[in-house]
Swiss-Prot record:
Pfam families: Acyl_transf_3 (PF01757). It is an enzyme of class 2 (transferase). PANTHER family: BLR4337 PROTEIN, GLUCANS BIOSYNTHESIS PROTEIN C. GO terms for biological process: glucan biosynthetic process. InterPro entries: Acyl_transf_3_dom, Glucan_succinyl_AcylTrfase, Glucans_biosynth_C. Coiled coil: none annotated. Belongs to the acyltransferase 3 family. OpgC subfamily. Its main location: membrane. The gene is mdoC. This is Glucans biosynthesis protein C.
Length: 385
């Protein structure tokens, strides 16, 4: 087995937590954006729409790179079956917990907010199933994708490790140009697959489980594997943690292209295929921007940072129904979009932290929302003297 570095990657922990917590301003700004969501303000805000688009354009690509990095690190630490079990428990248990406790109540609330409760009995069995798939998975989709990726990587990581044993990894060289070409080709390949499905059988693209399990996994798997390779090859990791003006400039241009596609593209034409190509390369370049920024400013340990690193998943899980509640019942009473956005942040973050502190004091909830069994310390077991 390859040795696992003893030094903790504090900046990667921090970046992962910040990317998770960015989901809060992302969804609150979605209320005030020009994008149609479950709940929207009376008038959209141009700047909050731009802010929302910026977060959406790169956040999950970078997140899956970090997930792949830590996943391969644990792959080297545990036997294969235990690695799969630990990884699936860490993401699967919180997902299964959040469905009845968070997204089901959220779905029921939205049925009444949007006036759809009366029409529910009239839906076909498939429409009910598909609606529940979209609404109950909801913002938990990335956890489902991680379960699928972990299962696929039982084979992929084994192949990578076997290939490394038969080759000299010190001779592997990477360049951002080469990676950009590879990810451009991957983006085009994904676009071709999506367009082919759209031509052959379009209804499957509106199927919630197919979207999450197949399409989302297919798009984000290259970033997950890229993270694993960054753990294996120090040169590749250094390529991402070293600031690059070229990547910053390219990412800025790609974001402009993303905005233009959002504004002028058509869903009936090539909008989604174009977006997949843009966000594939944009995500790669933003890995460099985010990693280099985080490596310079976040590579340290502190109690406050550790608190939010540990709390980030729970806060993310509970923020979504809180955001929708705020949008449905409080947003209509605030005339200013920016004031509403700030009030939403205070409302959602404040309640989420309170709920986090409460759940820490209930062992069952602490286990269910983390997937980690409660381990008693040896000192707790020792008899009093």
């Amino acid at each position: 087995m390859n040795p696992v570095p003893a030094q903790r990657e504090y900046f990667l922990d921090s970046i992962r937590a910040w990317l998770m917590l960015l989901g809060i301003p992302f969804h609150i700004s979605l209320i005030y954006s020009s994008h149609t969501w479950h709940v929207n303000s009376a008038e959209p805000s141009l700047w909050l729409t731009l802010f929302n688009d910026f977060i959406h354009s790169f956040r999950m690509q970078v997140f899956f790179v970090i997930s792949g990095y830590f996943s391969y690190m644990l792959f080297l630490r545990y036997p294969l079956k235990k690695w799969w079990k630990v990884r699936v428990e860490r993401v699967g248990i919180p997902m299964l917990t959040a469905i009845p406790l968070l997204t089901l109540p959220q779905f029921i609330m939205l049925q009444y907010v949007k006036g759809k409760a009366e029409s529910w009995p009239g839906l076909s069995l498939y429409d009910k199933y598909n609606t529940l798939a979209w609404e109950l998975i909801s913002h938990l989709w990335f956890l489902l994708v991680l379960v699928v990726m972990t299962t696929l990587c039982v084979w992929i990581f084994k192949r990578i490790r076997n290939n490394l044993e038969n080759s000299d990894k010190t001779n592997k060289k990477f360049s951002m140009v080469k990676l950009s070409v590879i990810f451009l080709c991957l983006g085009i390949g994904y676009a071709v697959i999506r367009r082919t499905i759209f031509i052959v059988y379009p209804p499957i693209l509106s199927n919630g489980m197919f979207n999450f399990i197949v399409m989302q996994t297919l798009f984000y798997l290259p970033f997950f594997i890229l993270g694993a390779l960054a753990f294996i090859f120090p040169h590749l990791k250094a390529l991402f943690t070293t600031p690059s003006r070229g990547c910053t400039f390219a990412a800025a241009l790609a974001f402009v292209a993303y905005l233009l596609n959002q504004r002028y593209g058509s869903g009936d034409a090539w909008m989604y295929e174009t977006e997949s190509v843009i966000t594939m390369v944009l995500g790669l370049w933003m890995v460099n921007v985010v990693f280099s920024f985080g490596h310079r400013l976040l590579n340290f340990q502190s109690a406050r940072v550790t608190y939010f690193v540990n709390a980030s998943l729970f806060i993310y899980l509970v923020h979504h129904p809180l955001t929708l509640f705020f949008g449905a019942y409080i947003t209509p009473h605030i005339t200013s979009n920016w004031l509403g956005f700030l009030c939403g942040l205070i409302f959602v973050v404040g309640i989420a932290i309170i709920l986090y502190e409460i759940h820490l004091r209930i062992p069952l909830l602490k286990f269910l929302f983390s997937g980690k069994p409660v381990v008693k310390r040896e000192n707790d077991k020792a008899p009093a003297r």
